[in-house]
Amino acid sequence: MPTISQLVRKGRKTAVVKSTAPALKECPQKRGVCTVVKTTTPKKPNSALRKIARVRLTNGFEVTAYIGGVGHNLQEHSVVLIRGGRVKDLPGVRYHIVRGALDCAGVANRLQGRSKYGAKRPKKK
């Protein structure tokens, strides 16, 4: 335990918190252009074909982002908005593509959790 005079001389070091989404540079979202759109398989206990895109951001970073929801309309040169948030069973995927923003369409026929997938409220019959 330090003495008071040692604390006056040096002070306490604050622990540096490492960012989970460094490519965003403290921004809530960033715009980018898809360079590759493909599927990949998840880690060991899970099995699927997860849709991902390699995105070149406006700040020069190139990141891998997950495309959530059922079906998508993305291809190379699509302009997308990405947010932070990793995918636990895909190593290296630390970003999500925002559905319903820029070139990425919302999920069709989505009735629950619509705001997370950019789906409009369905018309009443």
Curated annotation (Swiss-Prot):
Keywords: Methylation, Ribonucleoprotein, Ribosomal protein, RNA-binding, rRNA-binding, tRNA-binding. The modification 3-methylthioaspartic acid is found at residue 89. CDD domains: Ribosomal_S12. GO terms for biological process: translation. GO terms for cellular component: small ribosomal subunit. The keyword RNA-binding applies. Part of the 30S ribosomal subunit. Contacts proteins S8 and S17. May interact with IF1 in the 30S initiation complex. Belongs to the universal ribosomal protein uS12 family. With S4 and S5 plays an important role in translational accuracy. Interacts with and stabilizes bases of the 16S rRNA that are involved in tRNA selection in the A site and with the mRNA backbone. Located at the interface of the 30S and 50S subunits, it traverses the body of the 30S subunit contacting proteins on the other side and probably holding the rRNA structure together. The combined cluster of proteins S8, S12 and S17 appears to hold together the shoulder and platform of the 30S subunit. This is Small ribosomal subunit protein uS12. It comes from Clostridium beijerinckii (strain ATCC 51743 / NCIMB 8052). The lineage of its organism: Bacteria, Bacillati, Bacillota, Clostridia, Eubacteriales. The gene is rpsL.
